[in-house]
């Protein structure tokens, strides 16, 4: 299912936030975040892994490298809520907070009144 089709399937519940969590690191989640920013009438959250698991089951994304992604997303006003998932440590979270604490949050889009359907793909009419 595409991200927009998933979004269409949950908007009836009027969530506080729609977000991306786990499965991927910040580099791999970025294109999905940009798409979510484009379509979401709700706050946007993101909680990336500290990269993809390596051969030893660990995560190679450093706090500094994750903070660079988060800072870019914050400066682009893509996010309202940010955190970490698999492999993220207290140091990752500390740096995310530091790079975003003075940035303006993403503004919610105006609600669009039209039919939004979902299957594997979104259909908006």
Where are these regions (language model features)?
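Domain-level signal for soluble alpha/beta catalytic cores
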Residues: 1-125
């Amino acid at each position: 299912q595409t991200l927009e089709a998933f979004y269409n399937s949950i908007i009836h519940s009027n969530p506080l936030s729609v977000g991306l969590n786990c499965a991927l690191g910040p580099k791999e989640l970025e294109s999905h975040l940009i798409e979510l920013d484009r379509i979401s009438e709700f706050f946007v959250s993101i909680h990336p892994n500290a990269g993809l698991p390596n051969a030893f089951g660990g995560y190679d994304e450093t706090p500094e490298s994750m903070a660079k992604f988060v800072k870019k997303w914050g400066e682009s006003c893509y996010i309202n809520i940010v955190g970490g998932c698999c492999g993220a440590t207290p140091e990752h979270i500390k740096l995310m907070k530091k790079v975003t604490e003075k940035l303006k949050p993403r503004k919610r889009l105006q609600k669009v009144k039209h039919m939004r359907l979902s299957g594997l793909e979104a259909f908006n009419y």
